């Protein structure tokens, strides 16, 4: 590992709000072990975090700047506190919201702990006594399991036949796929068994082509499902919400692009993915332990977690 990373100088980690205090010290310990520099923070490797520390804390963890849960890291925290080694550079213009209007201004004040009377009225105007379970409403949930439950409920309301696509899984001898409570495979985001219908809302969970905007988080609606000569699902046709998404992809797949031109459909096929296999102790396995998964990188999207929606 040290030879592989011999030229490593800097690690950039995005979404700092998802990094717990314990994970910060795990990163420190791992780099010290790899580079055999036990007395130098992060083994002498530069670390740059990017993100928003005013977002909600990591799942089952503390904010990165707080004392870690694990007692083995507390000594290090009390002695030198890794977070104190960082220098903050604050970006002051919110490009995602743009000028944004009063709603964006309201959200920006709330994130700073400032709530005006008008802000409160704005939020309360969106309050409802009964849960909304129509196909146009997005629900925010705390866990992925709750998300999967709500997505399944909403999918059942979509008219038309249910189609299932099971992932093709190739694993080393003696290894089995790790399927999470919400039906996703490993840490890849894709479903072991993807259930869908024409007309269902979906979101991409893998970066297929960043130039073509076919990226993790791209949302749309299924407008068609195409099969091969063996009646196996070949691709899913998606009309994406963002104009221009998948234009290059359509040119590379003219067969279905022309057929679904009237709905701006983009064909999405199975992607080849490689999960990071780990030992029982949680360590990454080395050469000879490669696994491959082939699955359509979409999931039903009527709900998502609080953490997912804020990034």
Regions found by a protein language model. Name each.
Residues 1-310:
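Conserved ATP-binding/catalytic motifs of P-loop helicase motor domains
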């Amino acid at each position: 590992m040290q030879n592989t990373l011999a030229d490593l100088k800097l690690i950039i980690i995005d979404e700092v709000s998802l990094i717990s205090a314990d994970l910060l010290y795990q990163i420190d310990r791992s780099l010290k072990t790899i580079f055999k520099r036990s007395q130098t923070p992060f083994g002498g490797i530069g670390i740059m975090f990017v993100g928003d520390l005013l977002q909600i804390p990591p799942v089952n963890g503390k904010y990165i700047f707080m004392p870690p849960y694990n007692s083995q890291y507390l000594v290090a925290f009390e002695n030198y506190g890794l977070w104190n080694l960082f220098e903050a550079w604050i970006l002051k213009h919110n490009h995602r919201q743009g000028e944004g209007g009063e709603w964006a201004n309201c959200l920006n004040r709330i994130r700073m702990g400032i709530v005006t009377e008008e802000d409160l009225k704005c939020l309360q105007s969106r309050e409802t006594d009964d849960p909304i379970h129509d196909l146009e409403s997005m629900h925010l949930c705390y866990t992925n399991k709750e998300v999967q439950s709500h997505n399944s409920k909403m999918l059942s309301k979509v008219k038309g036949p249910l189609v299932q696509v099971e992932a093709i899984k190739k694993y080393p001898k003696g290894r089995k796929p790790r399927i999470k409570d919400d039906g996703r495979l490993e840490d890849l985001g894709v479903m072991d068994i993807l259930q869908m219908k024409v007309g269902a809302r979906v979101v991409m969970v893998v970066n297929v082509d960043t130039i073509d905007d076919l990226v993790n988080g791209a949302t749309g609606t299924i407008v068609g499902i195409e099969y091969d000569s063996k009646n196996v699902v070949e691709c899913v046709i998606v009309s994406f919400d963002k104009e221009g998404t998948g234009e290059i992809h359509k040119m590379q797949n003219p067969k279905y692009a022309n057929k679904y031109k009237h709905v701006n459909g983009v064909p999405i096929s199975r992607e080849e993915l490689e999960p990071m296999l780990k030992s029982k102790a949680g360590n990454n396995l080395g050469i000879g332990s490669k696994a491959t998964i082939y699955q359509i990188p979409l999931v039903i999207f009527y709900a998502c977690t609080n953490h997912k929606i804020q990034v």
